[in-house]
């Protein structure tokens, strides 16, 4: 957990990534929005949260995907768009890298829909 010395702008960035994970954020966009140098954002975010802002965003998207995969019948294409991927292929690749199985396999194993 970040210490009390964590700069407030980093907590703000993390909150924005949590709430707006479907938006195609990049370091450039974060720099524009928060008026902090992107290299500083990358360095300090990683320092306090133990992963880069983009890795954090990806993890948040995967978490949302897992919820949608197990609680809805939405197609993979639909889910990938909803959580912010520009293509289902990128989503599937990202999901598999994170979870070691495809979204379809994850759904088969963990679906809460009977």
Predicted region positions:
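Basic/polar phosphate-binding segments, predominantly the helix-turn-helix DNA-binding elements
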Residues: 23-60, 80-105
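A short, Lys/Arg-enriched amphipathic alpha-helix from helix-turn-helix/homeodomain DNA-binding modules
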Residues: 1-25, 31-36, 56-74
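Intrinsically disordered, low-complexity basic tails/linkers immediately adjacent to helix-turn-helix/homeobox/MYB/SANT
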Residues: 112-114
């Amino acid at each position: 957990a970040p210490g009390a010395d964590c700069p407030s702008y980093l907590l703000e960035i993390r909150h924005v990534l949590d709430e707006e994970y479907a938006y195609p954020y990049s370091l450039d966009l974060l720099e524009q929005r928060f008026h902090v140098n992107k290299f500083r954002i990358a360095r300090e975010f990683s320092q306090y949260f133990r992963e880069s802002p983009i890795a954090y965003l990806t993890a948040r998207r995967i978490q949302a995907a897992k919820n949608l995969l197990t609680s809805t019948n939405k197609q993979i294409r639909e889910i990938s768009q909803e959580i912010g991927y520009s293509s289902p292929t990128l989503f599937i690749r990202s999901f598999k890298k994170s979870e070691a199985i495809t979204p379809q396999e994850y759904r088969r194993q963990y679906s809460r829909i009977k």
